[in-house]
Amino acid sequence: VSAFLLNRSSDLEILVKLDLLKSLGATYVACFVDGQLQGTFAQAGMKLPLNMKEISPDGPNRPQTPKGPFPYITEEMTFTNTKAGATLAGTLTVHKGGAKCVMIMVTGSGPENRDEEIYAHKPFAVIADRLARAGIATLRYDDRATGQSVGGDMKNATSIDLAEDAAAGIEWLRAQKRFKKVGLLGHSEGGLIAFMLGAQKKVDFIVSLAGPAVKGDSILLYQSRNSGSPLAKGITMEYLRNMMKGNKWVEWFMDYDPTENIAKTKCPVLALNGTKDCQVPAAQNILVLRRLLAKNKKTVIKECEGLNHLFQHCNTGRPDEYYNIEETIAEEVLADIVGWVNKL
């Protein structure tokens, strides 16, 4: 932990940048109170309350993290987005018996590694493991300028730029001529990107996990008002926009309306949203998806009862629970993905 002293009050306030949060590009401002840190987690313009206490040096228990022996092969590879000057490093996971289809996996907002790692959870590694065991291949990769990926401007990149990275990965997969179908699994912002590429007919099918279906300013206003702070309920759209000025990604996201690209998407879609998601509200987004994809064949849209933004079983759904939950991703979600893809 690296800490920077902000003042010398009796409640020492510090700015903490944790190793666990490096991949998120997030910060944490807190005070020491009764032996623990009580503060605010901030990422990509979103601010949420988060309390933290010292943990065992052995780290948290994550029982779903894949452990060998594995019935599949992992291949380290790279592909290039020439326009952005980015070389993306990733892992191709394929069952030893081969696979007919493959999914490229696209992470949520902020710089993230190929496992979409957060608080020692590795959801993309868990998903890739489960899919490979079911004969479904995956390609997951570090975001541009993150992990082993080099080049490209991540700080000022919008979802349009990151969609071009994903498109380069799709082109690489098709060039391998190993798979009959190439799909895209996107989480959160990755779901947004999935529909961008779906509208361009770049993929054969889409799995959207907590992907937004409404304009970005509505999403951020919901997040802010449901952050748990007593003052948050009174936040207005005007205040939010003024607060976010200067953050290129947030300004772009607030103005972006995904409905046009969703309506243009004609490939099969599996869209899952957790009912306790405090970042992308299920009811609001599911309603829009059902309307826009009503005529889309082989599409399944589902609210996952009791699950948060990471698709963990939870109490409140707020991000301050993520660390303490041992489950990385609900088993029923993994089963839904495998079952749906295998029926295509």
Question: What does each model-found stretch correspond to?
Answer:
Residues 155-176:
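Alpha/beta-hydrolase active-site loop
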Residues 265, 271-273, 277:
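Short beta-strand/loop motif that positions the catalytic acidic residue
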